[in-house]
């Protein structure tokens, strides 16, 4: 599939007021205009797109959907056909609500909700950060990356990602346990768009990575996080496989944000690396690797997602 990367992410949250403050004042996002049909939800901008993050009222905090961006109409149509030929149930989405030309919805083999769209609304030079900020690196690479936890890691999940979605397998990283990193076909700027980590009887978001335009933006966000005594997962550091500097802190939703800047443009290694350790400097772990967002599947998935997961789930 000719997919650029993650175009938008949607969440359910019971902490709308906390996000309304945290998004602009900590991350530097702009509060966007909510669609007429979804006034109770909170939409955030991080570039000239209509939105990148949407938070919908809910009883708990959890991921609602991942929106993958196809390059254009023909690529979108080919991707939808590929999903259907693979036997994946595809449902029509609400294009007006998402602010796109067209969108469909489907599930991965462990129950997470995905969407595929093309042509999201945008307006040049319209992004105004919520605080002084140099801006986010998104555009042609997508908004960043997401790492999900899954209680089961069936071969069908790898098949879905590499054969159906057409993602490149990047590797397992240096973490302990089973983790796999993937990037979309058209992403030549970052090592991964999505990763799945195996956590027995656990599901949810482990972290989301956001790229900012310069080191100052990383440092100023780091200072704000410390000044507000927000919980942190890892201090400033540099991963072994990426020429980037980043740190991790926890959001109101219980998952971490990794705030990243590039020291130099990333280039594909040409072969799968097997790093001795996660980072070459820094990234001292000062908080849990799995935050409050990672919980039992019954607290993370809706009934349809749980039904899909039940095909692989081992009895306790």
Regions found by a protein language model. Give the residues of each.
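Core segments of cupin and vicinal oxygen chelate
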Residues: 1-51, 148-191
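Vicinal oxygen chelate
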Residues: 5-14, 58-152, 180-185, 229-316, ...
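A compositional/structural signature marking long, glycine- and acidic/polar-rich segments
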Residues: 174, 179-243
């Amino acid at each position: 599939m000719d997919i650029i990367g993650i175009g938008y992410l949607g969440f359910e949250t019971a902490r709308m007021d906390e996000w309304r403050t945290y998004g602009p004042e900590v991350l530097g996002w702009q509060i966007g205009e909510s669609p007429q049909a979804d006034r109770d939800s909170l939409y955030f901008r991080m570039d000239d797109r209509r939105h990148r993050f949407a938070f919908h009222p809910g009883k708990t905090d959890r991921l609602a959907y991942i929106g993958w961006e196809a390059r254009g109409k023909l690529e979108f149509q080919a991707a939808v056909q590929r999903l259907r030929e693979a036997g994946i149930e595809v449902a029509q989405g609400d294009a007006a609500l998402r602010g796109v030309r067209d969108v469909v919805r489907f599930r991965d083999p462990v129950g997470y909700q995905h969407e595929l769209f093309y042509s999201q609304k945008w307006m040049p030079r319209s992004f105004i950060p919520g605080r002084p900020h140099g801006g986010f690196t998104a555009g042609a690479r997508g908004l960043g990356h997401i790492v999900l936890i899954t209680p089961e890691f069936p071969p069908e999940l790898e098949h879905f990602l590499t054969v159906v979605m057409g993602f490149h397998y990047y590797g397992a990283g240096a973490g302990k346990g089973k983790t796999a990193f993937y990037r979309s076909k058209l992403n030549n700027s970052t090592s991964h768009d999505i990763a799945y980590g195996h956590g027995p009887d656990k599901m949810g978001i482990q972290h989301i990575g956001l790229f900012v335009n310069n080191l100052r933006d990383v440092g100023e966000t780091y200072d704000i996080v410390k000044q507000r005594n927000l919980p942190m997962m890892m201090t400033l550091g540099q991963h072994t496989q990426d020429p980037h500097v980043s740190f991790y802190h926890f959001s109101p939703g219980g998952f971490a944000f990794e705030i990243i800047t590039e020291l130099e443009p990333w280039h594909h290694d040409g072969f799968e690396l097997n790093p001795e350790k996660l980072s070459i400097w820094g990234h001292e772990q000062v908080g849990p690797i799995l935050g409050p967002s990672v919980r039992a599947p019954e607290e993370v998935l809706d009934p349809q997602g749980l039904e899909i997961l039940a095909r692989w789930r081992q009895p306790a």
